[in-house]
Swiss-Prot record:
Its EC number is 2.1.1.228. GO terms for biological process: tRNA N1-guanine methylation. This is tRNA (guanine-N(1)-)-methyltransferase. Residues 77-114 are annotated as: Disordered. It is an enzyme of class 2 (transferase). It comes from Corynebacterium jeikeium (strain K411). Homodimer. GO terms for cellular component: cytosol. Pfam families: tRNA_m1G_MT (PF01746). S-adenosyl-L-methionine binds at residues 149, 173-178. The gene is trmD. SUPFAM superfamilies: alpha/beta knot (SSF75217).
Length: 282
C-alpha cells in the first residue's frame, strides 16, 4: 500500500515511522510520503488560508494551493515527485500518469488504462463516522491520500474538484472538533494498515478485535493468576476450548450491552445470545 499525506505540519506524522507501521515500511508492505502543503504556495509568506466568504470567524484553506497539491500527489509530479518518503520505495509511481500542460488536471474515469483512481480521505467533523468496516475496505487499497485540513477547513470546491482524479471520502473519527486532520490520519492509517496481511504477526489478532463481529471485545487476562487480590476467571484455565469460547462470547455480549447497546441492533445474534442478554441485569 502507498500512503500520501498532505499537511502543513509534516513533523506531526512522525509516528508513522514507528511500531507496526514502521515495521510494515521496513518490510516493503507500506510506503509513506508526507507532503508539506506550503510547497505549492506562490507568495513570499507561503500562505495557505484566507478569510471565509460571507464573513465569520477563522480562516479557510485556499483552493489555489490545495488543488495543485492534490493534482501532483495523484500524478506523482511537481513537488510530490521529489518528496523524501519515509522509506526508499517508489513503487507507487509505476502506474501514475503525467500532468497536463495547461495547468488543469485531466479528469479520469474510475479506471484509466487499468489503473484505479487513488482514494482521497478528507478528515472532517462533517464527514461520515469512521468505522471498522471502512478500515477493512481501505486496507485493500493500493494508493490512499489523506488531506489534512486546518482552521475552518478546506474550501469545499477542492473536495468537489478532487472527484476528477480521486475517489473521495469525507470522514469523521468522532463527534468532536480537533485543531487539524493530522491526529485523525494517524488513527485511520493505523486502523487500516494493521489489517493488511503480513503487518500483524498473528492474523487472528485482528479477527478477534472489537467490532470485527459487531460487538465490543471482552476483557483480556495474562499471568499471574492472582494479582492484588484479583483472580483470572477459572474458566480460562479449564482447558475446555468450547467453554472458553462461550465465556468470551458472553463477556463480549455483556460489555456491548453495558457500554454500546446501540451496536446490538445490527449484530446477528443466536438464540443462545438472546437468552443470555435477556438474563443480564446491568
Amino acid at each position: 500500500m502507498r500512503l500520501d499525506v498532505v499537511t502543513i505540519f509534516p513533523e506531526y506524522l512522525e509516528p508513522l515511522r514507528h511500531a507496526l507501521l514502521g515495521k510494515a515500511i521496513e518490510q516493503g508492505i507500506l510506503s509513506v510520503g508526507v507532503h508539506n502543503l506550503r510547497a505549492w504556495t506562490n507568495d513570499v509568506h507561503q500562505s495557505v488560508d484566507s478569510t471565509p466568504c460571507g464573513g465569520g470567524p477563522g480562516m479557510v484553506m485556499k483552493p489555489e494551493v490545495w488543488g495543485p497539491a492534490l493534482d501532483d500527489v495523484a500524478a506523482g509530479t511537481g513537488p510530490a515527485a521529489t518528496v523524501s518518503d519515509l522509506e526508499s520505495s517508489a513503487e507507487h509511481k509505476r502506474n501514475l500518469r503525467p500532468a497536463t500542460t495547461n495547468g488543469d488536471a485531466e479528469p479520469l474515469g474510475e479506471k484509466a488504462g487499468g489503473v484505479t483512481k487513488p482514494l482521497l480521505i478528507v478528515p472532517t467533523p462533517a464527514g461520515k463516522p469512521f468505522t471498522q468496516d471502512m478500515a477493512e475496505r481501505w486496507s485493500t487499497e493500493e494508493h490512499v491520500v489523506f488531506a489534512c485540513g486546518r482552521y475552518e477547513g478546506i474550501d469545499q470546491r477542492v473536495v468537489e474538484d478532487a472527484h476528477n482524479r480521486y475517489r473521495v471520502e469525507e470522514v469523521s473519527i468522532g463527534d468532536y472538533v480537533l485543531i487539524g486532520g493530522e491526529v485523525a490520519v494517524l488513527v485511520m492509517a493505523e486502523a487500516m494498515v494493521r489489517l493488511i496481511p503480513g503487518v500483524l504477526g498473528n492474523q487472528a489478532s485482528h479477527q478477534e478485535d472489537s467490532f470485527q463481529d459487531g460487538l465490543l471485545e471482552g476483557p483480556s487476562y495474562t499471568r499471574p493468576r492472582q494479582w492484588r487480590g484479583l483472580d483470572v476467571p477459572d474458566v480460562l484455565f479449564s482447558g475446555n476450548h468450547a467453554k472458553i469460547a462461550q465465556w468470551r462470547r458472553e463477556q463480549s455480549l455483556a460489555r456491548t450491552k453495558k457500554i454500546r447497546p446501540d451496536l446490538l441492533d445490527s449484530v446477528e445474534l443466536s438464540k443462545a445470545d438472546r437468552a443470555y442478554l435477556d438474563g443480564l441485569e446491568l
